[in-house]
Structures are given as C-alpha cells and as structure tokens.
A protein has these predicted regions:
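Cleavable N-terminal signal peptides
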Residues: 2-3, 13
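A cross-kingdom marker for long, charged
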Residues: 217-289
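Positively charged n-region of N-terminal signal peptides that target proteins for export
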Residues: 1-2, 246
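Structured, acidic catalytic/metal-binding patches in enzyme active sites
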Residues: 16-19, 23-30, 35-219
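Short secondary-structure boundary/capping elements
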Residues: 14, 41, 223-227
C-alpha cells in the first residue's frame, strides 16, 4: 500500500500545466497557458514558473483588469428579453432560479451581460473564482515583487470584444443557456486537464463549444496574430535582451493558428518544457439538438 501511494505521488508530481520556452536572439519568453478562473487545488504553480517570474524583466498578460480607470461600457440596444424565443426564455428563468439570481434583472440586461453573470455565478457556486485565476494570481505576485506587469491589450479592448458582438451577444448567451447543464462536469475536467497539462484533452475542450467563424476570428485568431506581432516587434514594450513570463489563456496556445505556431514563424525557437500526464476525466461532445 505504501509503495502504491509513493508511486502514485511520484507519477502525479510529473504532471504540470503546459508551458514553453521561446527564444529569439537575446529575448527569452516563458509561455504559460492560463485558466482565467481557479481554486486552491491549482497551486502552488511549478517552481519553473515562479522562478521565471522572479528572474524576469516583466510579466506579460492579456490585460491587467486592475487598471479599469476610464473604461466605458457602451449603451446596448437589445435586452436579453428581446433576443430569446419562448423556449430559451423558460430555460433562462429555470437557470436563474437555480442560481438564486433575479430573473427580471437578467431579462432587462444586454445578452452579453446576462451570459457573463450566469457563467460567473455558476463558477462561483462550483468553488471557482476569477481572483484565483492563474493570470490574476501571478499579476498580484509580480506586483508584490516589484516586477512590471505588461498588458498585451487594454481592458477597454476586452470590454468592446464582449459588448460589441452581433445582436449584443445573443450567440454567446444562447450557448451559455444550452450548455448550462454540462458546465459543472466540463469545468471540472478543464481544470483537471489544465493541471495535468493534457494537451489532447484541452484540444477536445476547445472543440466542445463550436463558435461561429466570426466569434472565433474575433476572440482567438485575430488576437493571436496581434500578440505574435507585438511579442516579436523591436518597438513594442519588451527589451530586446530580456526574460519575460507570458501568461495567456490556454486556448490561445493550442489548435490551428495558435500563438506558439505564430511565434515560430516569427523566428522564435520554441520548446515545450512542461511534463504532462493524461487527466482522469473525459469531455464528451454535446448532442446537437
């Protein structure tokens, strides 16, 4: 029994979240795939990551949500009640009751805001919070160590990304409602796959929710291209001779046209440094109605 426990512990110790080292001339980037929400089971992070932060010239994240001064939320024309059919309205009512959320308030909110509210409340009920997300945790750690925190894009850009979707975010809202029953299992497996660095499972997760080509282009493809251009530019915010820790959502680092591939095309030599294990969970594609 003791041998089994020791063997299991040793095997588990090998598993860690996905991270890479990218080098080009005198610039070294340690790139970690993040999950934007989390819980204490995701910590401590691998010592290679905390050491990379401690010895870095800066932490680069998607955006520093602590810098919210001057952020403007546009006036949306459509409410949630405007965009849902009768069946979807009933589904929203049932979901809001199960989460203890005010249905009328959700119905009068823009679709994107309703979707975000439902997702955050559901994650909170499952024990996950954005304050425990990997990027937020590392940003706070960087600040206490007097390490610069560098944003790839301003917070206003991310707000606009959410609020200026077609029909004020109807597609995102409908997906949130239809996938609500699976979220508990899916999020659990996502966190387990992230902790294990299970690339195959994370790719399966990315294929679970089929975004429209427009959303995929806006949320993933265009941003990956923009980030690769910035990280490889001589006139952006990075020193040409420096070490940086880059932390972006894991979905930006897997699949077609990911940031790793784009950096390689920009002349970076990239090596995966993390040791992975298969996660003990399964994603299943939801049946299409």
């Amino acid at each position: 029994m003791v041998l089994f426990v020791l063997a299991f512990s040793a095997r588990q110790a090998l598993a860690e979240p996905l991270y890479w080292q990218a080098k080009k001339e005198d610039l070294t980037l340690t790139i970690l795939g993040s999950v934007h929400v989390g819980d204490e089971s995701m910590y401590p992070l691998p010592s290679a990551i905390t050491d990379a932060l401690k010895n870095s010239d800066g932490l680069v994240i998607e955006t520093d949500i602590r810098k919210s001064d001057g952020v403007v939320y546009p006036h949306n024309k459509l409410t949630t009640a405007d965009v849902l059919n009768e069946q979807q309205l009933q589904l929203l009512t049932d979901i809001s009751k199960s989460l203890g959320m005010p249905t009328q308030q959700l119905l009068s909110s823009p679709p994107w805001a309703t979707s975000l509210s439902i997702q955050m409340q559901q994650l909170k009920n499952l024990g996950y919070g954005s304050a425990s997300g990997v990027d937020a945790t590392l940003a706070n750690k960087a600040t206490t160590q007097d390490i610069p925190v560098i944003s790839l894009e301003p917070l206003q850009f991310q707000i606009d990304l959410m609020t200026k979707q077609k029909d004020d975010g109807k597609e995102w809202l409908v997906s949130s409602l239809e996938e609500f029953d699976q979220t508990d299992r899916v999020v659990h497996c996502l966190i387990e796959s992230w902790k294990a660095g299970d690339l195959a499972k994370l790719e399966a997760f990315s294929e679970l929710s089929e975004m429209s080509p427009e959303l995929e282009k806006a949320f993933l493809t265009d941003r990956n291209i923009d980030w690769a251009n910035k990280l490889s530019a001589n006139n952006w915010k990075l020193k040409s001779k420096g070490n940086y820790l880059i932390v972006v959502g894991t979905l930006h680092l897997i699949g077609e046209g990911n940031l790793i591939q784009l950096l390689e095309k920009k002349g970076f030599s990239v090596i995966q440094q993390s040791q992975s294990q298969p996660a003990q969970c399964q994603f299943e594609a939801s049946p299409k109605g």
